């Protein structure tokens, strides 16, 4: 018995439709629980084949586990559902898609890629163009994370072509957003060498400029659709991209829009990111007092959200901003706060940067004994980190193991794009 033949194809549509690429880089959109309840009720009252019911119920339980954030358990249920088997290819396609999404959340990207490929092949076999579009989007996002940008672009193009052919404006907007994310990630990967914003290789500029074009195209559609949350996400990524390109005034405009939309929805986390990003842009525009005000608002929101890592980042940024203004005593106050939080978080890289900054500030004030004290602490931490990096590099198959350790610092330099919870760029003065 095919479940999608009953209840106006309720079961397969309920499983398939929500697995769309939403306007974020987190590729899973979980199933609507009211629809799941209807599916469960349908299964309960329908006398179907035992195989179909068991497979579906295992898949539903897997979805429920993912809903509460237990993706490992979700994977177990989905894989059990596949082992039980189903004759309904659309249900199988949905399970493949959910498995790919669950593995994506677990950061097991090779497995995610495997199941999204299965889903893509199955949707093509079924002649399900809408499913193929969504599978292409999921596959593209996974390839992007793996750094396989050219392949990701092909998937995004297929996603866009299908949705355009179906006059699906929502799907087109998502495909364009994904396009922008791929080119943004490609550009960032090329210039990820500690270079100043704007001072990046030409190849990176080309990719980032393409990203801005796709984000602008996406904005034109989501504005027509009246989708304010999608507009907010795109403005955030557009601002991040302009920042990397050195277009700081444009970054301010984009992040200003992001801030307005975040306030509109009471999204304090997005509001905090927007304030931080605005502070970063104003630093490069030379408007240090304005930057400081935005960082202070970032700090206030971080404290409200009880996010100690972001609180540390904000203190570090404020310390550096006051150093630029030559207000060294205020800079010391903020760097001390950064140091205390870094110690609480056991963040040795953050501690080292705080000590370095404190040493510089005390030197500027002529407090030579304190400057020496913090310089010595910085030296001890630096040696410790270098030893760790040596062993990490020696025993790791990755050549960038040392870099990964340094960039994992809670309260030091942290960059993530809007679709992965936004940008916490810090202005590092060393």
Q: Where are the model-predicted features located?
A:
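Repeat-mediated protein-protein interaction surfaces in helical alpha-solenoids
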Residues: 30-47, 72-83, 118-121, 217-220
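Alpha-helical segment of the N-proximal tetratricopeptide repeat
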Residues: 54-83, 101-107, 188, 199-202
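Conserved alpha-helical positions within TPR/SEL1-like repeat arrays
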Residues: 56-67, 91-105, 131-145, 171-185, ...
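Eukaryotic all-alpha helical interaction scaffolds
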Residues: 65, 83-85, 103, 123, ...
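Structural signature of alpha-solenoid helical repeat scaffolds
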Residues: 49-50, 87, 127, 167, ...
């Amino acid at each position: 018995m095919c479940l999608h033949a009953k209840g106006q194809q309720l079961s397969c549509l309920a499983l398939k439709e929500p697995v769309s690429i939403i306007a974020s880089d987190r590729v899973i959109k979980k199933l609507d629980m009211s629809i799941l309840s209807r599916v469960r009720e349908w299964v309960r009252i329908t006398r179907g084949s035992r195989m179909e019911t068991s497979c579906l119920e295992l898949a539903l339980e897997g979805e429920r586990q993912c809903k509460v954030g237990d993706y490992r358990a979700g994977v177990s249920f989905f894989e059990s559902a596949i082992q039980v088997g189903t004759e309904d290819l659309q249900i199988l396609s949905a399970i493949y898609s959910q498995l790919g999404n669950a593995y994506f959340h677990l950061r097991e990207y090779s497995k995610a890629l495997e199941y999204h490929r299965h889903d893509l092949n199955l949707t093509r076999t079924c002649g399900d163009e809408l499913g193929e579009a969504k599978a292409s989007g999921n596959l593209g996002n996974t390839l992007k994370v793996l750094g396989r940008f050219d392949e990701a672009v092909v998937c995004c193009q297929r996603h866009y072509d299908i949705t355009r052919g179906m006059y699906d404006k929502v799907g087109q907007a998502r495909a364009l957003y994904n396009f922008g994310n791929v080119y943004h990630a490609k550009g960032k990967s090329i210039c990820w060498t500690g270079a100043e914003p704007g001072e990046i290789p030409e190849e990176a500029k080309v990719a980032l400029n393409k990203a801005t074009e796709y984000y602008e195209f996406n904005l034109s559609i989501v504005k027509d659709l009246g989708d304010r949350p999608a507009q907010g996400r795109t403005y955030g990524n557009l601002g991040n991209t302009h920042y990397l390109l050195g277009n700081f005034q444009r970054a301010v405009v984009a992040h200003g829009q992001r801030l307005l939309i975040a306030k509109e929805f009471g999204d304090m986390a997005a509001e905090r990111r927007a304030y931080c990003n605005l502070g970063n842009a104003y630093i490069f525009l030379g408007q240090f007092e304005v930057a400081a005000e935005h960082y202070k608002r970032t700090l206030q929101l971080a404290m409200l959200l009880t996010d100690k890592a972001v609180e540390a980042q904000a203190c570090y940024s404020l310390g550096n901003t006051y150093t630029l203004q030559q207000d060294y005593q205020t800079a010391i106050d903020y760097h001390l706060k950064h140091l205390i939080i870094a110690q609480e978080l056991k963040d040795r890289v953050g501690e080292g940067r705080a000590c370095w900054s404190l040493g510089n500030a005390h030197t500027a004030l002529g407090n030579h004994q304190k400057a020496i004290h913090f310089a010595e602490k910085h030296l001890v931490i630096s040696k410790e980190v270098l030893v760790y990096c040596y062993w990490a590099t020696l025993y790791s198959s990755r050549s960038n193991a040392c870099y990964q350790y340094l960039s994992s610092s809670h309260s030091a330099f942290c960059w993530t794009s809007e679709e992965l919870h936004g940008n916490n760029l810090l202005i590092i003065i060393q």
